């Protein structure tokens, strides 16, 4: 779950205007639009934070959120969202409840990711879908992973294997941040070799964590990277990009 996962309350940053979040959202929706068969699904957003994805996921049905941090839950409830307090490892829902489950940048925060995937399978309806986004490539591990309390980054093979063990069948698996990957990988490897840490200081509290991580990029850079995200999302509607800093996976319970 997201007890240490960063969140983005409205007074800190608008995620829809930040290139990283907007690019992930567009890529995700572009892939889902070609797979989700109808618009009246029961949807669960695991580790939903303050509910920043609710208005996007609402195009596919009625959304319920699961979060274990009371602070973002309070923000979500002020927005009028249905968010339940609970753990991803022990979800407070009946079996076969949801046709669509999302866990967006969640499982890397979980010590027992297999238990989380098993719970997703339990509450997923037959024929339902599980959508996961998560950081890619353990060799890209950096100080940013540490300050965000990640346990791991994933290879495509590892994620496929863990989903299969939980009972899911992968329908699509693609990488995102394809176009920024070469520069990002180069900078991370240089920092690893020199023992440098990024400019972001390790936060002292959860409140500091999301404010530090969500520090916006400069408007010109943000605009360019947002445009790159539009191009990538268009491509992802048709093809699975072979490399990137993150993974987007859509798996089915059959």
Predicted regions and their residues:
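Conserved N-terminal segment of class I S-adenosyl-L-methionine
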Residues: 1-96, 100-104, 117, 215, ...
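Short, glycine-/aromatic-enriched active-site segment of Class I SAM-dependent methyltransferases
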Residues: 13, 130-152, 156-164
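Short conserved AdoMet
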Residues: 58, 77, 111, 125, ...
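Residues lining the SAM
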Residues: 104-107, 133
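A short glycine-rich, Lys/Arg-flanked "PGG" loop and its adjoining helix->strand segment in the class I
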Residues: 114-129
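Conserved S-adenosyl-L-methionine
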Residues: 168-178
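A C-terminal cap/extension of S-adenosyl-L-methionine-dependent methyltransferases
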Residues: 180-254
């Amino acid at each position: 779950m997201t007890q240490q996962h960063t969140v983005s309350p409205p007074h800190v940053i608008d995620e829809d205007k930040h290139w990283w979040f907007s690019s992930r959202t567009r890529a995700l929706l572009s892939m889902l639009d070609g797979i989700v068969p109808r618009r009246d699904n029961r949807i669960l957003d695991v580790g939903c934070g303050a509910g920043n994805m609710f208005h996007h996921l609402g195009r596919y049905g009625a959304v319920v959120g699961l979060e274990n941090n009371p602070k973002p839950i309070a923000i979500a409830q002020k927005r009028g969202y249905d968010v339940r307090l609970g753990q991803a490892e022990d979800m407070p829902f009946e079996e076969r409840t949801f046709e669509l489950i999302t866990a967006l940048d969640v499982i890397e925060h979980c010590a027992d990711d297999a238990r989380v995937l098993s719970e997703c399978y339990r509450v997923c309806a037959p024929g339902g879908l599980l959508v996961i986004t998560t950081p890619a490539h353990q060799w890209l591990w950096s100080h940013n992973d540490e300050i965000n309390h990640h346990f791991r980054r994933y290879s495509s093979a590892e994620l496929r294997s863990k989903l299969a063990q939980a009972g899911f069948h992968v329908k699509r698996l693609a990488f995102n941040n394809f176009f920024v990957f070469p520069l990002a990988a180069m900078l991370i490897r240089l920092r690893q070799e020199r023992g440098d840490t990024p400019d972001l200081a390790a936060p002292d509290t959860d409140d500091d964590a999301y404010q530090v991580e969500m520090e916006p990029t400069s408007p010109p850079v943000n605009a360019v990277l947002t445009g790159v995200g539009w191009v990538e999302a268009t491509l992802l509607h048709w093809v699975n990009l072979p490399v990137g800093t993150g993974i987007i996976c859509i798996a089915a319970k059959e």
